[in-house]
Amino acid sequence: MRPEVANATNANDTFLNCSSLTSLAGEVGACKSYTQELGFDYEVVHSIIIVVVPLFFGIIGILGFAGNLLVVVVVAANPGMRSTTNILIINLAVADLLFVIFCIPFTATDFVLPYWPFGNVWCKTVQYLIIVTAYASVYTLVLMSLDRYLAVVHPIASMSWRTENHAIQAICIMWALILAVSMPAIIIHGEVTYVFQKPNGQSENLTVCRFLNEQYNWTVFQMTFFLTSYVLPLVLICIFYMSMLISLWRSARDSAESRRGRRRATRLVFVVVGVFAVCWCPIQVILVTKSLEVFPLTTAMIMVQIVSHVLAYTNSCINPFLYAFLSDHFRKAFRKIIYCRPRAEVNNRLGPPTKTTRATNSGNNL
C-alpha cells in the first residue's frame, strides 16, 4: 500500500490526525514551521524533547532489556523457582522485552525527528507490535490474577488445573488470540505525507507514521483499545482480587506457613498490577481525549503528555525491581546470577522442587 498524501494548510491538521501511541512525535515535528498557528511554544517543546526523550527512553531501554532478560534467565536456570506464577512472570518479561527491543527505539526516534525515516512497512509493524505487547502485558496480568484466585479460593480443587503445562497452554492461546485480534492495527496505520503550503508560496513535504483517520475512525479505535486493553482487564483483575482477599483473610483451615506463602505471592501480583494501572492510566486518558478532539494543545499539556509517555514506558522496566524488592527468592537468585555464583549453590539456597512442595504450593514459590 502506498503512503497517503494529504494537503495541510496549517499545522493543526496534523494535530487532529495523530497516530495511536506515537502521535506526539509526528505532531511536533510536522509543525516546526507553523509555530505561530499553535497554542504552544514549539521551540520550548522541541528543546525538551531532544533532551528528555533520548535520556529517559535510553535508560528505560537499557534497564528494561537487562532486567527482563535477567528475570527470564533466573527462572529458567533455577528449577526451584518453576511454578505457574513464575511461568507467567517469564511471559510478562518476554512481552516487556519485545516492547523494549522493537518499540522504544523507534518511538524515541519518532519523537526526536520531524519525520518518519523507517518506511511504511516498519511504520505498520511498530504500531502492530505496540498494540500486541500492550495486550500481552495486561492479559498476562489477568492470567496471573486468575492463577492467584484459584490458588487462594480453590486451593485443592485447582491443583489439577494449575500446572506448568496448563500455564504454557494458556499463554500460547493468549498470544495466538492477541496476534490475530491486533491485525487491524497493520491496516489502519501507515505513512502519510503532508504537503504544507508556506506563506512564500513554497511547499514542504513531511512524512509521518500515524493512524489513517481519513479512511478509519480513530475515536472508535482508541475507545475500543482503551476499553479492551485497560478497563476490561482491570475490572477482571479487581473481581479476582476482591474474591481472593475475602477468602485469604478468612481462611483458617490451612497452616500458617501455607497462608503466608499465598499472601506473599498474592501481594507480589497485586503490586505488579497496581503499578501497571498507575503507569498506563495517564497516557490512556490522554489518548482518549485526543481521539475525541478535546485535548488542549498548550505547552503545559504537551509536557504532561511527554511525562505520560515516559511513565507508561517505564512500566516495561520496573517489574524486575518489584520482584527483587518483594520476593526473597528472586532477590537471592538475582544476586547469584549477578555475582556469578555456581548454579548448584543457587539451587541449594532456593530449595529443591520436591514433588510434594510443587503439588501443594504451585505458584507460591516466589
For each predicted feature, which ranges?
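Intracellular effector-coupling site of seven-transmembrane GPCRs
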Residues: 199-218, 226-229, 246-285
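Alpha-helical transmembrane segments of multi-pass membrane proteins
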Residues: 61, 91-100, 104, 171-182, ...
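Seventh transmembrane helix
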Residues: 275-281, 285-288, 304-354
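Extracellular TM2-ECL1-early TM3 structural module of rhodopsin-like
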Residues: 46-58, 84-146, 150-164
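First transmembrane helix
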Residues: 49-78, 98, 238, 242
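Loop architecture of class A 7-transmembrane GPCRs
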Residues: 32-44, 111, 115-131, 154, ...
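Intrinsically disordered regulatory tails of 7TM GPCRs
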Residues: 1-41, 196-202, 256-263, 328-366
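Helix-to-loop junction signature of class
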Residues: 57, 98-114, 127, 134-141, ...
